[in-house]
């Protein structure tokens, strides 16, 4: 297995490392990996074609794959809650259709929640996550987005967004306890992920993962090559570039938000050339997955978004 760039110095033996670098300038030896000559591959999440409040059948996954291929994307990230079926025949049909169109199924976006004082609820979400890993493996998808979950004290998601993603813990509990639950729960999933060959990507997605510091607290506590970061450019509402830079070395998949027509909850003016420079400096070579979250029709907004990302992430 190729060692992750952030773990090289940590796991290399001191003698072997010093011997291997003898006669080499340290600044050259410790350079991050560079991106491929053609730049990062650009994919699209099926979320980009799916309306928030519409029925799943509005955009079946196979139609998203076909439309993504027609638009010129390299791959597709599948949103689980958009799938019409979890039957194996359906999974293999999606895999076959992607192969026919020359498309990678490169990401699987799932939901779970571990911020719950009830151990039985947390275990139920652990088993759910393991099941989702099995689905990703069956489709040959190499990485899966996971969440910490949240306290739920904000009520609806709209209320959470009005509070800029910030919510207090349940009465009688603390965020520190919540982190302990999340670390224990996700930590119990990584061996299954390793067995199935699916790298988990913890997203900066509200809850205890709202900040880069929160995500890093979990990643570093578990310390597994099978738990990395799914980095969402649109989920840092304060100091976005500083926080993106903190998580860039851990990133296995980047989700890139665009907001043509205005966002549903907010609109961010993201500087993608700057973001691409941050990711290049960290040695990120993985997929950039478009998540279009605006009110404009995907038929026009998604191709425009692809052009922006191609331009920014080309070598």
Regions found by a protein language model. Name each.
Residues 74-75, 104, 142, 199, ...:
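Residue-level detector of anion-binding/catalytic polar loops
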Residues 13, 20-23, 97-107, 115-228:
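Active-site acidic/histidine proton-transfer and metal-coordination neighborhood
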Residues 58-61, 90-93, 122, 126-129, ...:
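Charged helix-capping and loop-helix junction motifs
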Residues 77-81, 200-204, 230-232, 289-291:
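Short catalytic-loop micro-motif centered on adjacent basic/acidic residues
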Residues 86-92, 119-122, 299-301:
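Metal-dependent catalytic neighborhoods of phosphoester/phosphodiester hydrolases
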